[in-house]
Amino acid sequence: MELAAEEGFDIEDVEGAIEEAGHGPLPVLAVVGRPNVGKSTLVNRIIGRREAVVEDKPGVTRDRVTYEAEWAGRRFKVVDTGGWEQDVLGIDASVAAQAEYAIEAADAVVFVVDAKVGATDTDEAVVRLLRKAGKPVVLCANKVDGPSGEADASYLWSLGLGEPQPVSALHGRGTGDMLDRVLEALPEAPAQTFGTAVGGPRRIALIGRPNVGKSSLLNKVAGEDRVVVNELAGTTRDPVDELIELGGVTWKFVDTAGIRKRVHLQQGADYYASLRTAAAVEKAEVAVILVDASESISVQDQRIVTMAVEAGRAIVVAYNKWDTLDEERRYYLEREIETELGQVAWAPRVNVSAQTGRHMEKLVPAIETALAGWETRVPTGRLNAFLGELAAAHPHPVRGGKQPRILFGTQAGTKPPRFVLFASGFIEAGYRRFIERRLREEFGFEGTPIHISVRVREKRGAKKK
């Protein structure tokens, strides 16, 4: 902190920046309810921008179903569970399915009901699901635009979920009071502590687009004699997590139901899969991304990779069906990996065959490598010596007659590694990427995303208003 003061930074600002970057995983809020009650409109209101899809139609493709939000200085993630229509599986089944996977990954739930329509049989079915899950619930009575609407909302006491929060998601009425209740229900984001041991078996999400061989791979690594526990935290229909022994160590594979139970839906299958993948990634520490090496790398493959990176998980990429490739396909696959999956060039890679079991023994070392990178901590003194040498050898380009300097830096957290750099001016994105590359060359960080945030020193003498 002495260095911060010498360089003209406000100590409180520095401490705040480090604390903000150093939090562990953010708490998760799921927004659930039947179609057309205004879930996506409410999500847009919560996150403060028009980003969620506002049509409740099955088959609407979304790159993301998880968004980051902030209220009263606290940050959290919002899972939007919109996107289902009555003719997907029958309304009860479709709502129960999408709600169940979101609730599984959530710390608290906002249950949205149309106050004008009142409680329906479908709403009652969701209430039963919420009671079974045991998660904190905030009941949102939406489409309340005035006193008559508040009277409608009061009827929702009958659901037995406590006081209904009268809200108009469209106009913003009542959303502040509702979010205050949400903060009461959500746990605080855990502070980051270096070297904290993770309780229980390490958690793995096996993810990938449909039909890449996830089921075959899971069966191959598990084997009936090696499944330690089959139904942990089971949902109403099928097991969610499985404990599997690999390399003499027990690992928890999360949401194996989504792998073992093949989903055959005429509509909404992509959305169903992406929601399920997002929920699995949220619960995991490491994502093993399975790619079908016999086919061209698809946009969906890239989306799944991006989802895991943005979630900040340790990552291993496994290329399945490797034994089926001829020399020509291997050549073109290498080119595709360079161009399409360059964003995870740092991730350990294993070439496997779920069918024959080829190279399965390489999976555990790759996972362990990724977790080690994910938990790597660089001492502050060593980090600043590295930054000083880097800036001396490769200074930031001059812009507008000025050359921004990195004054000092610190690692605010791990899982994934998060760094805060304090600078005399704006640091361009290209230079940040250069710093990340050199950090990886110097300290490893194999198998993990790295987050770098920059705080710029205010001009000396500038008064805060």
From Swiss-Prot:
Keywords: GTP-binding, Nucleotide-binding, Repeat, Ribosome biogenesis
Record domain EngA-type G: where: 27-190, 202-375
Keyword Transmembrane helix assigned: no
Gene designation: der
Biological source species: Streptomyces coelicolor (strain ATCC BAA-471 / A3(2) / M145)
Entry binding sites for GTP 1: 33-40, 80-84, 142-145
SUPFAM superfamilies attached to this UniProt entry: P-loop containing nucleoside triphosphate hydrolases (SSF52540)
Sequence positions that bind GTP 2: 208-215, 255-259, 320-323
Family recorded in the similarity comment: Belongs to the TRAFAC class TrmE-Era-EngA-EngB-Septin-like GTPase superfamily. EngA (Der) GTPase family.
A single MF term (Gene Ontology): ribosome binding
Biological process terms in GO annotation: ribosome biogenesis
Top-level division of the source organism's lineage: Bacteria
Assembly notes: Associates with the 50S ribosomal subunit.
KH-like domain mapped to chain residues: 376-458
This protein's name: GTPase Der
UniProt cross-references to Pfam families, sorted A to Z: KH_dom-like, MMR_HSR1
Task of the protein: GTPase that plays an essential role in the late steps of ribosome biogenesis.
